């Protein structure tokens, strides 16, 4: 039986998301492979992706009340993971995502979704971690919103 990690890699290859060759990453680093998460384009794909992330979440015993999906690619990942956790594993967590700029009308604020509160444990859901730029951008926003404990 394949592990969730093996099934995830197989899924990425089958969907032409994981590519092999000589690539220059956004960070400027060279790599023998590239993950093009923009190739996930269907409900079936994003549902499967959410399940792989949910399995990883559970395998690593992540203790979080809320999943944060940094704009933009992290948004569907946080939503799909929250759905998979609730539907397939009986684990109900909130989700939210940051805006690129603070909204000063309507509901306002920097985040959409589950409200972050002091003492909350949150997990940041990202598609690919290379340079950590997305984390460096979203962490100050999170800390400004509430004093939370963050896992990535």
PLM-predicted stretches and their roles:
Residues 1-126, 130-152:
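PRPP-associated nucleotide enzymes
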């Amino acid at each position: 039986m394949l592990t969730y990690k093996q099934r995830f890699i197989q899924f990425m290859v089958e969907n032409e998301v994981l590519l092999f060759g000589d690539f220059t990453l956004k960070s400027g680093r060279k790599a023998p492979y590239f993950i093009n998460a923009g190739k996930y384009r269907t409900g079936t794909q994003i549902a499967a992706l959410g399940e792989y992330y949910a399995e990883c979440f559970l395998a690593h015993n992540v203790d979080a009340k809320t999943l944060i999906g940094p704009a933009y690619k992290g948004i569907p990942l946080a939503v799909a993971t929250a759905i998979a956790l609730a539907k397939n594993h009986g684990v109900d967590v909130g989700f939210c995502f940051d805006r690129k700029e603070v909204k000063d009308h309507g509901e306002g604020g920097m985040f959409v979704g589950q409200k972050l509160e002091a003492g909350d444990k949150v997990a940041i859901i990202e598609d690919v971690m290379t340079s950590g730029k997305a984390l460096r951008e979203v962490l100050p926003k999170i800390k400004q919103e509430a004093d939370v404990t963050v896992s990535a």
